[in-house]
């Protein structure tokens, strides 16, 4: 029995928005929301086909940001404020990709959480 495919509901959004970039040591996630915090588009390195150690590369973050930004641009978003969280590689590449996709970056803010000597950190890597 064939299922009826429904068309995805496309909603026009306001021209202003917020980009949340979470760059961990293992992955990068980009979420674009409107000013109220409702998600407009999102993307991650794993969603774009990167696996394993390739997920935390500047190229992966560039592809991830471009995908989310193009989707938001098509829905009508033009100006964004950027919030970056995490120590991962490719933080700068993600912002450059947002600008390359046509979104005007108005402000960049680093909201990486810093402990006031909380939990003991993981042991040092020996590479």
Curated annotation (Swiss-Prot):
GO BP annotations of the record are: translation
- At the top level, the lineage of the source is Bacteria
Q: Name one GO molecular function term.
A: structural constituent of ribosome
| Listed InterPro entries | Ribosomal_uS11 (IPR001971), Ribosomal_uS11_bac-type (IPR019981), Ribosomal_uS11_CS (IPR018102), Ribosomal_uS11_sf (IPR036967)
UniProt keyword Ribonucleoprotein present? yes
Which keywords describe this protein according to UniProt?
Answer: Ribonucleoprotein, Ribosomal protein, RNA-binding, rRNA-binding
Quaternary structure annotation from Swiss-Prot or TrEMBL: Part of the 30S ribosomal subunit. Interacts with proteins S7 and S18. Binds to IF-3.
Q: Give the protein's function.
A: Located on the platform of the 30S subunit, it bridges several disparate RNA helices of the 16S rRNA. Forms part of the Shine-Dalgarno cleft in the 70S ribosome.
UniProt family annotation:
Belongs to the universal ribosomal protein uS11 family.
In Swiss-Prot or TrEMBL terms, this protein is called Small ribosomal subunit protein uS11
Q: Which organism is it from?
A: Chlorobium luteolum (strain DSM 273 / BCRC 81028 / 2530)
Phylogenetic placement of the source organism: Bacteria, Pseudomonadati, Chlorobiota, Chlorobiia, Chlorobiales
Q: Which gene encodes it?
A: rpsK
């Amino acid at each position: 029995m064939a299922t009826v495919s429904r068309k995805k509901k496309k909603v026009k959004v306001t021209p202003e928005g917020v980009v949340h970039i979470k760059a961990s040591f293992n992955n990068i996630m980009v979420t674009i929301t409107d000013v109220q915090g409702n998600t407009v588009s999102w993307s991650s390195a794993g969603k774009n086909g990167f696996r394993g150690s390739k997920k935390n590369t500047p190229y992966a973050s560039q592809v991830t940001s471009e995908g989310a930004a193009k989707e938001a641009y098509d829905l009508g978003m033009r100006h964004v404020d950027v919030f970056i969280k995490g120590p991962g590689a490719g933080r700068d590449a993600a912002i450059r990709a947002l600008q390359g996709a046509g979104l005007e970056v108005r402000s960049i803010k680093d909201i990486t959480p810093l402990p006031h000597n909380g939990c003991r950190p993981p042991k040092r890597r020996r590479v």
